[in-house]
């Protein structure tokens, strides 16, 4: 099938496949409609007005195979969305921090200002609900100010919003993250407006033994607008520092925003059901409210979300470990590959590489693999890392690496930019990198290429000819002006200048609750390229690594 063809979808009614006898009845009707459409001028035929979406189609097939029972709660494909850019700034839906390309001193942080302003404006437009999720600690500094200023504007406009704020808490590390304290802090900052704002504030850990908690970063307002990506609301990492983390969110409106709300309802349903267990959930509320597990559903009712544009989007998340064991409706039976170098002495059960049930409740993992697999010419990956902290986690996702190896072997160009390994913490995950050297990525790709091709020479040709790999820089200088290495926190995959993922899900093994959007729009992908991928490579190519055994290349 060529890239400009869209495969036919199986006929459905209310989300279910049609029975054969019902399908048989539709055949004469469909033939008649086909005849009519064929007779129409091309300008009025439906297909002429609907651009092909080969990437989303491939991903949707994977999702229906892996997690059919989670459609509408953890993943959903929608049309009629709009990338939420302000007038006069068509690429303004892309929210980068700090946005000071080319300046190691990062004096003008235009991207950060745009992000905080967008957060405030979205919240200020609320009439009913505001839904926020992040990794602990709670939003502070300028991020908290954006939330408070937006809520004050809502109340000043005569509304009484319901607000949920959910953070994922790592055991022990986040013992000082106390929802009741944050609730009280918000009430104090809201002042007189606090009486009109109903709060649910919670921290949650779904599995201590499998290291699972919320990692999604969402701001959903009235189920109509959403901001999501990799940015945590932490002032010390993003705002009040001379070496801010480079990160990206995206903003949209339309049915995909409602999809994000449904995902948050799924997380809050678990949170509310476990609110009496302090080993799992700490909850604080205001104004006598109870826990609100279905706030988004209650707001939306049975009315479908209104379309606001023409952009097709797949919203896709994951449930990590501890919320749901498996999707009982899934007939998914993968052939799970193995690799001896994914284990590091004593480790945890390998959910990423060796657990079919985990796959069925974490559809985002196969969605990202399918996005990469759908590439025909090139793949751009911008991530904190591709390898995890091993132990306790497995070193890498075998199927993701195998998919990348398959692309390299097929002549597809692959560019990977990751956070400078100099950001590695004392135990790997203590900083914004988990590797000591870029060789850990290129050596793994070579190993998987040899396993795929069975030939060292073929593997070398594919690796040397088609891979670009670099550590992140945002200016010509090797470090920030204060001498600190550049930290990258993107969770971004783009293919063929046509489709891309922006969200909170890393490509390395991590069993968290995550969420993101996969967008297929050549126009938006070109904006992403111009505003982020091109400047990123302009500076990062100076830190490009040549894989072992490959001839040195000129940067470019």
UniProtKB/Swiss-Prot annotation:
Subcellular localization(s) per the UniProt record: Secreted
UniProt GO MF annotations: phosphatidyltransferase activity; phospholipase D activity
GO CC terms in record: extracellular region
Broad class of the protein's primary localization: secreted
Keywords of this entry: Disulfide bond, Hydrolase, Lipid degradation, Lipid metabolism, Repeat, Secreted, Signal
EC number in record: 3.1.4.4
Record-level GO BP terms: cardiolipin biosynthetic process; lipid catabolic process
Region described as Disordered: spans on this chain: 326-360
Summary of activators and inhibitors of this protein: Inhibited by mercaptoethanol and dithiothreitol.
UniProt domain PLD phosphodiesterase: residue ranges: 210-237, 484-511
Function: A reversible phospholipase active on phosphatidylcholine (PC) and phosphatidylethanolamine. Lysophosphatidylcholine and egg sphingomyelin are hydrolyzed about 50 times and 100 times more slowly than PC, respectively. During the transphosphatidylation reaction straight-chain hydroxy compounds, such as triethyleneglycol and triethyleneglycol monomethyl ether, were phosphatidylated in good yield, as were monosaccharides. Disaccharides and sugar alcohol reacted slowly, while N-acetyl-D-galactosamine, D-galactosamine and D-galacturonic acid were not phosphatidylated.
Designated name of the protein: Phospholipase D
């Amino acid at each position: 099938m060529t890239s400009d063809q869209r495969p036919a979808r199986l006929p459905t009614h209310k989300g279910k496949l049609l029975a054969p006898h019902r399908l048989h009845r539709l055949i004469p009707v469909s033939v008649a409609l086909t005849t009519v459409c064929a007779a129409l001028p091309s300008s009025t035929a439906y297909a002429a007005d609907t651009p092909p979406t080969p990437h989303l189609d491939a991903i949707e097939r994977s999702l229906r195979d892996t997690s059919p029972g989670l459609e509408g709660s953890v993943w959903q494909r929608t049309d009629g969305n709009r990338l939420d850019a302000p007038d006069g700034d068509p690429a303004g839906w892309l929210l980068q921090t700090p946005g000071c390309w080319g300046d190691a001193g990062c004096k003008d942080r235009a991207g950060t200002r745009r992000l905080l302003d967008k957060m405030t404006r979205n919240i200020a437009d609320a009439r009913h609900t505001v839904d926020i999720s992040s990794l602990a600690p709670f939003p502070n500094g300028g991020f908290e100010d954006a939330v408070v200023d937006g809520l004050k504007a809502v109340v000043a406009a005569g509304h009484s919003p319901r607000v949920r704020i959910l953070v994922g808490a790592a055991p022990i590390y986040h013992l000082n993250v106390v929802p009741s304290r944050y609730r009280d802090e918000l009430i104090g900052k809201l002042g007189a407006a606090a009486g009109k704002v109903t709060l649910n504030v919670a921290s949650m850990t779904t599995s201590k033994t499998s290291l699972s908690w919320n990692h999604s970063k969402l701001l959903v307002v009235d189920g109509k607008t959403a901001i999501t990506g990799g940015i945590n609301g932490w002032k010390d990492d993003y705002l009040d520092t001379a070496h801010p983390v480079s990160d990206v969110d995206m903003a949209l409106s339309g049915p995909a925003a409602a999809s994000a709300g449904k995902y948050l309802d799924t997380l809050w349903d678990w949170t509310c059901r476990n609110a009496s267990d302090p080993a799992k959930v700490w909850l604080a509320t205001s104004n006598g409210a109870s826990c609100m597990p279905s706030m988004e559903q209650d707001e939306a009712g049975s009315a479908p979300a209104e379309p606001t544009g023409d952009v097709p989007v797949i919203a896709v998340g994951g449930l990590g470990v501890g919320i749901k064991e498996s999707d009982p409706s899934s007939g998914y039976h993968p052939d799970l590959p193995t690799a001896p170098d994914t284990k590091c002495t004593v480790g945890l059960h390998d959910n990423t590489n060796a657990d079919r049930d985990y796959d069925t409740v974490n559809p985002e993992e196969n969605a990202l693999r399918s996005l990469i697999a759908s590439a025909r010419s090139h793949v751009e990956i911008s991530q904190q890392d591709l390898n995890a902290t091993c132990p306790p986690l497995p070193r890498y996702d075998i199927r993701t690496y195998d998919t990348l190896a398959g692309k390299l072997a097929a002549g597809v160009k692959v560019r990977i930019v990751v956070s400078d390994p100099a950001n590695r913490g004392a135990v790997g995950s203590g900083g914004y990198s988990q590797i000591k050297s870029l060789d850990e990525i290129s050596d793994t790709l070579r190993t998987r290429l040899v396993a795929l091709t069975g030939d060292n020479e073929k593997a070398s040709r594919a690796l040397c000819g088609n891979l670009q790999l670099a550590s992140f820089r945002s200016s010509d200088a090797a470090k920030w002006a204060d001498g600190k290495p550049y930290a990258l926190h993107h969770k971004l995959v783009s293919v063929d200048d046509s489709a891309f993922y922006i969200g909170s899900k890393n490509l390395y093994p991590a069993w968290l609750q995550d969420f993101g959007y996969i967008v297929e729009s050549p126009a938006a992908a070109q904006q992403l390229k111009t505003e982020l991928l091109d400047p990123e490579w302009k500076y990062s190519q100076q830190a490009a690594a040549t894989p072992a055994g490959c001839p040195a290349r000129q940067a470019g």
